[in-house]
Amino acid sequence: MTEMKILIVTLTYIEKSIIDEIVNNLSSYGLEVDILFDSRKYLPISAFNWERLQYDAEKVLSFLKSKYDFNYDSIIFLADSDGYIDGYNFVFGLTIDNFAIIFLNRLREEFYNRKPDLELFMKRVVKEVTHEAGHTLGLGHCNTIGCVMNFSNTVEDVDKKQARFCKNCIYKIENLSKYLQRK
């Protein structure tokens, strides 16, 4: 596969072990992954919905797209907050074009008043980052059982899927990579 470049931008503190797992997982597909620990570490207050106590994911991504104009195939933001889009109570992540954001709050056991579990949290974050990376690279949702591109409506859905693309999704990424190489 031609190397496609992904930038991961942490907007809040993320444990190094989690970042390492994200890089390892995405790199295993031949993707080049860079990390930017953004010192500004903020989300636009104009995107915060005070009635819902959540960020409007579309507004956040529009804001971030205007601030990060780097030469990457995919730019993925990580934020330790809660997000939504119209029509949904929440989203784990959202992708628009080659930009994505993952909201980490609901991936933590503590959100559900359960005992903290860093290992489970790490697995969930890796799955959702890989999922949104797939979207930024042109993949849609997949119905293959266990594929990381399965839609997740609940954290239990996240737990059921693997952190890996199925064969069909890998094939699609490889074909896209070959197409981009010819351009």
UniProtKB/Swiss-Prot annotation:
Top-level class of the enzyme under EC nomenclature: hydrolase
Q: One Pfam family name from the record? A: Peptidase_M54
In the record, biological process GO terms are:
proteolysis
The highest taxon in the source lineage is: Archaea
EC number(s) reported in the record: 3.4.-.-
The note on cofactor binding and number reads: Binds 2 Zn(2+) ions per subunit. One is catalytic, whereas the other seems to have a structural role.
> Active-site positions, per UniProt?
E132
The residues listed in the UniProt record as binding Zn(2+) 2, with positions renumbered to this chain, are C142, C147, C166, C169
> What keywords does the record list, in alphabetical order?
Hydrolase, Metal-binding, Metalloprotease, Protease, Zinc
Q: Which GO terms describe its molecular function?
A: metallopeptidase activity; zinc ion binding
Q: Which CDD domains match?
A: Peptidase_M54
Q: Which HAMAP family match?
A: Archaemetzincin
Biological role: Probable zinc metalloprotease whose natural substrate is unknown.
PANTHER family in UniProt: ARCHAEMETZINCIN, ARCHAEMETZINCIN-2
The family note in this entry says: Belongs to the peptidase M54 family.
Q: What's the protein called, per UniProt?
A: Archaemetzincin
Native organism is Saccharolobus islandicus (strain L.S.2.15 / Lassen #1)
The organism that produces this protein has a lineage beginning with: Archaea, Thermoproteota, Thermoprotei, Sulfolobales, Sulfolobaceae
What gene, per UniProt, encodes this protein?
Answer: amzA
